[in-house]
Amino acid sequence: MEASRFIEIGLLTRPHGLKGEVCVDYYADSPFLLEGTVYLKAGRAAPRPVKVQSMRMHKGRPLVIFEGVNDRTAAELLRGHVMLVPEDTLPELDEDEVYLFELEGISVVIDESGEHLGVIERIDTDAYQEIWVIRTPQGKEVLFPAAAPFVLDIDLDSRTARIAPPPGLLDIYLSD
């Protein structure tokens, strides 16, 4: 049986309070992924399973207590750890939804011209937006705002995304 691939769902940023809570930069839409067992990974170490004892939201961000982490000192040791879940535990999505990790490596085509812009190298996210980091065939990096008016279609079967870039955006990155 093939081992499941791990998918990054968050980053442990800092302790919160004195009782072992850890602030999480959380990349998923559903907090249910923070129930039960998750995996933590530091650097090149293998992911290790940890049990989520409790989770609550504070100022729009999850605060998590892991089993065996009972104070601020223990929580501090988790700073910078990546939180993962096995890919095969992710819920099924609706037909018009995708997981961000599924976008990595797909071709990006400019709708107006049909021109191949490049390949999505990675996805950067913050509290406000999702940015596709696209690598062109010439090796240039394009930061593309993955907002509804600009992303027209994503076809995972053909591994392509059709975009309508805002006026002038590509000139910033592609002009010599």
Swiss-Prot record:
GO terms for cellular component: cytoplasm; ribosome. Coiled coil: none annotated. The keyword rRNA processing applies. It is found in: Cytoplasm. One of its GO terms (molecular function) is ribosome binding. Transmembrane segments: none annotated. Keywords: Chaperone, Cytoplasm, Ribosome biogenesis, rRNA processing. It holds the Pfam family RimM. The keyword Cytoplasm applies. It comes from the Bacteria. One of its GO terms (biological process) is ribosomal small subunit biogenesis. Residues 95-169 form the PRC barrel domain. The PRC barrel domain binds ribosomal protein uS19. Binds ribosomal protein uS19. Belongs to the RimM family. An accessory protein needed during the final step in the assembly of 30S ribosomal subunit, possibly for assembly of the head region. Essential for efficient processing of 16S rRNA. May be needed both before and after RbfA during the maturation of 16S rRNA. It has affinity for free ribosomal 30S subunits but not for 70S ribosomes. This is Ribosome maturation factor RimM. It comes from Nitratidesulfovibrio vulgaris (strain ATCC 29579 / DSM 644 / CCUG 34227 / NCIMB 8303 / VKM B-1760 / Hildenborough). The lineage of its organism: Bacteria, Pseudomonadati, Thermodesulfobacteriota, Desulfovibrionia, Desulfovibrionales.
